[in-house]
């Protein structure tokens, strides 16, 4: 059994060598042994799940690994393991497509495309189940997938014994949406084209089991591995209130029959994960009672009988709380650190490191950086070096690999210089950063500002040369003389700034693209050359098309492009501003953005510039702007006009006009105002 990461690394290296040499039976033998240990009850961190997830080198991008897994399935079709790996990779694709956004801001096309990837994952796992006498591992993964993205209709059709339809109904109901989802899936492959046969294990599902899908998949997994903590943790997670559950349901589950088979440390781990639902939301630093409640909760969890990895996890979470409370930024780029909080964070991380170094990498590296490089906690720099050294041989963390690359490139943190190893580490970090949502330019900027300017500059140049857009953008800032909120006038270089700006725009960095659009707009105000405005529009449109709602340029790009389009003479441009730009700002913006967009729309529908004037819609948008921000300038300016104030019988006339205009709203304007699926309660809808 691989009790340590180094034992596991040796086993993985042997499996990779066998796979590379097409010794597929040897790969099966190695995987069979590790899986059997897991089936027998092993819970080691570096077991079967870890080996499946990392067998195909994560330093390669997802499309490359998918193709390798497909070839492995073709060359060893009767083995369950390549199909399990293929399904796990498609599971990762689901996450990449859905992204790290909150559930409220994920676009429908992302859900649809993630559903297409889900179908590939489930189909691959059906192959695994058909080829495996005890497929507990993939049954646990199917539990997670059914909770996360729902069961596909075709799987339920197969289990009911009927004819399964993949995408005919979906294409008929929303052809444009299906095309968009296929386009989002395209970097990884095409939609599933054929379904495997249903394995006998999954036949004969009752109607009640269709109604309670999570219970069905959990029982399938537990029937094979009764103490499957991974499956139990998955089920518990989807009892969080955010997924429609409750803390009472979670506690009932922990105290219930399914968890009764667990040893005390395993059941206590479930208790820890239950508490994480609320501990994950950081308290207000100014609320002493809330802060005390959090500290007491973490202390209470550490009083439980926990295994090493769970205890390390709680310690890392407590350190993150310390980081949140210990970092104060009263003004932008003026950061103060609470020495008591940060010292406690360091103590927590030191204890966690002694228990589980990998946990510190996964859950605490950002906090450890802050302790060592910015808060300058005694001993934190030594711990930082120890953590990096302990994981160098086996880590697949892009964040850790970036720091290891810097250490090996420049001899930092007590490491010897090894240029070849530094290059390998940085290449791995670059490959894994997108999948892990890690910004390597932040590591380079922290290195530049807090450790070594030459080493930081070298990393930025290496990352920029490798095509990392954010690092190119950081180089633009550096050659303007400012990085990480600090001034570096010695680095000002207009020629380099211009060169890296062009490269960053070509590479698609949205911040640099937005800044160039803004600069062109400013230049147009000084010199009204139409070409400048057209270039500005084109760059803003790129930001609008490519940015996600959580990106920093999404809101200002929508606002600025809306203003530019609405200031023109073309009604089509004005309608684009209203429906494609102001609408999303209202539905997805914060309160200030909503107030701005609603005030703009109140003006638009009152005066009817580019769209038909409509007193009813003007009134609706005015009230929305007032609710979002009562002192908004547009509200104060527009209320007398829309409400008919200051005119004889103005208020009553305005009210009657609004009632009449309600029946004149076209469908597109109605759905802009009340939601894309809203339908007015009348029958004379005007066509778009």
What are the roles of these predicted feature ranges?
Residues 6, 25-75, 86-134, 138-224, ...:
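Short coil/linker segments at helix-helix boundaries
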Residues 69, 125, 218, 254, ...:
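Hydrophobic/aromatic packing residues within the alpha-helices of TPR/SEL1-like helical repeat arrays
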Residues 78-80, 131-134, 227, 306-310, ...:
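Short helix-capping/linker turns of helical repeat alpha-solenoids
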Residues 151-153, 242-247, 277-285, 327, ...:
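Alpha-helical linker/edge segments of TPR/alpha-solenoid repeat scaffolds
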């Amino acid at each position: 059994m691989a009790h340590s990461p180094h034992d596991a690394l040796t086993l993985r290296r042997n499996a990779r060598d066998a796979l590379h040499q097409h010794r597929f039976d040897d790969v099966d033998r190695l995987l069979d042994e590790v899986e059997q240990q897991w089936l027998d009850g092993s819970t080691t961190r570096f077991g079967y799940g870890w080996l499946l997830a990392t067998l195909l080198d994560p330093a390669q991008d997802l499309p490359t690994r998918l193709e390798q897994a497909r070839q492995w399935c073709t060359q060893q079709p009767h083995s369950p393991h390549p199909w399990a790996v293929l399904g796990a990779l498609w599971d990762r694709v689901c996450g990449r497509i859905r992204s790290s956004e909150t559930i409220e801001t994920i676009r429908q096309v992302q859900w649809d495309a993630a559903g297409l990837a889900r179908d590939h994952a489930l189909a691959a796992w059906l192959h695994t189940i058909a080829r495996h006498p005890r497929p507990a591992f993939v049954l646990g993964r199917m539990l997670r997938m059914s909770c996360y993205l729902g069961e596909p209709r075709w799987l339920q059709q197969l289990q009911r014994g009927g004819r399964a339809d993949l995408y005919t109904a979906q294409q008929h109901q929303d052809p444009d949406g299906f095309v968009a989802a296929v386009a989002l899936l395209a970097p990884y492959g095409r939609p599933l084209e054929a379904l495997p046969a249903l394995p006998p294990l999954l036949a004969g599902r009752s109607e009640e089991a269709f109604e309670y899908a999570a219970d069905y998949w959990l029982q399938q997994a537990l029937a094979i591995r009764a103490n499957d903590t991974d499956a139990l943790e998955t089920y518990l997670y989807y009892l969080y209130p955010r997924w429609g559950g409750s803390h009472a349901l979670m506690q009932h589950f922990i105290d219930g029959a399914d968890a009764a088979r667990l040893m005390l440390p395993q059941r206590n781990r479930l208790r820890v994960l239950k508490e994480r639902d609320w501990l994950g939301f950081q308290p207000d630093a100014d609320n002493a009672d809330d802060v005390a409640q959090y500290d007491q909760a973490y202390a209470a969890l550490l009083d439980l009988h926990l295994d090493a990895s769970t205890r390390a996890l709680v310690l890392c979470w407590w350190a993150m709380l310390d980081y949140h409370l210990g970092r104060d930024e009263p003004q932008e780029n003026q950061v103060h650190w609470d020495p008591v909080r940060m010292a406690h964070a360091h103590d927590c991380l030191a204890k966690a490191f002694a228990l589980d170094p990998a946990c510190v990498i996964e859950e605490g590296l950002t906090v450890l950086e802050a302790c060592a490089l910015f808060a300058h906690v005694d001993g934190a720099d030594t711990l930082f070096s120890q953590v990096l050294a302990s994981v160098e041989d086996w880590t697949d963390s892009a964040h850790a690999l970036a720091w290891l690359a810097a250490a090996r490139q420049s001899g930092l943190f007590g490491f010897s210089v090894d240029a070849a190893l530094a290059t390998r580490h940085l290449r791995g970090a670059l490959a894994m950063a997108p999948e892990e949502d890690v910004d390597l330019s932040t590591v380079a900027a922290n290195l530049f500002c807090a450790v070594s300017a030459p080493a930081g500059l070298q990393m930025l140049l290496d990352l920029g040369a490798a095509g990392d857009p954010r690092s190119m953008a950081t180089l633009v800032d550096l050659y303007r003389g400012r990085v990480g909120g600090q001034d570096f006038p010695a680095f000002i270089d207009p020629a380099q700034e211009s060169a890296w700006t062009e490269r960053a725009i070509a590479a698609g960095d949205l911040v640099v693209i937005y800044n160039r659009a803004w600069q062109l707009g400013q230049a147009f105000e000084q010199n009204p050359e139409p070409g400048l405005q057209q270039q500005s529009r084109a760059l803003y449109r790129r930001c609008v098309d490519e940015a996600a709602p959580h990106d920093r340029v999404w809101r200002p790009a929508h606002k600025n492009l809306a203003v530019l389009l609405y200031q023109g003479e073309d009604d089509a441009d004005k309608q684009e501003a209203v429906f494609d730009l102001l609408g999303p700002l209202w539905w997805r913006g914060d309160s200030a953005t909503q107030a701005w967009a609603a005030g703009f729309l109140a003006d638009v529908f009152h005066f009817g510039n580019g769209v038909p004037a409509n007193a009813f819609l003007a009134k609706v948008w005015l009230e929305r702007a007032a609710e979002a921000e009562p002192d908004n300038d547009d509200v104060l300016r527009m209320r007398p006009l829309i409400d008919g104030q200051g005119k004889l019988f103005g208020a009553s006339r305005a009210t009657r006009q609004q009632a009449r205009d309600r029946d004149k709203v076209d469908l597109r304007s109605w759905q802009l105002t009340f939601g894309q699926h809203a339908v007015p309660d009348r029958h004379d809808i005007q066509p778009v």
